[in-house]
Amino acid sequence: MNNIELLIQNGNTVYFPVVKEGITWELKMQGMPGKLNFTVIKDGILNFQEGNAVRMKVNGQNVFYGFVFSKKRDKGNEIKVTAYDQLRYFKNRDTYRYTNKTASEVIQMLAADFNLQTGTIEDTGYKIASRKEDNQTLFNIVQTALDLTVQNTKKMYVLYDDFGKLTLKN
């Protein structure tokens, strides 16, 4: 049986809520954020809101770090919560023009602009001469840069969230 530890942080207060059975954790490799669904029991102490950090460990291993995006309270004392990792912010649309950047540098640029945390971002090496991305999701901007890298180097890279840090690996 797995030992699951889930906590929610609201400011400086950390809660270890009573979680009902049925936590679901979804990971997809391309173009989608990690998603955590769970139901907590509302008591007189638990106080959290959208945007608060959520962390989950399984058997002592860090597996999910994200943020509450929605919560729905039923007629009783149960609150259904959906949290996403920071790749959720890659669904934002924006316009970018860049010159002579690697896919790694594009990811670091987007992370800096959106205040996202990065971990290991491997150097993809291939410099993209010039690109204009008009009203594209950040996922599409990154995927285009990675596709151009694969076409020119035959090396494939994967972007994922490693417990709260954007990570790019070959």
Which residues make up each language-model segment?
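Assembly/oligomerization scaffold segments
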Residues: M1-Y89
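Solvent-exposed, acidic/flexible segments
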Residues: N47, T99-S104, D134-V142
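Alpha-helix C-terminal capping segments
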Residues: K57-V58, A111, T118, L159
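Short beta-strand-centered interaction patches in the first periplasmic/extracellular domains
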Residues: E78-I79, D85-Q86, T120-N170
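Second-shell loop/turn segments in exported
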Residues: N92-N100, A129-K132
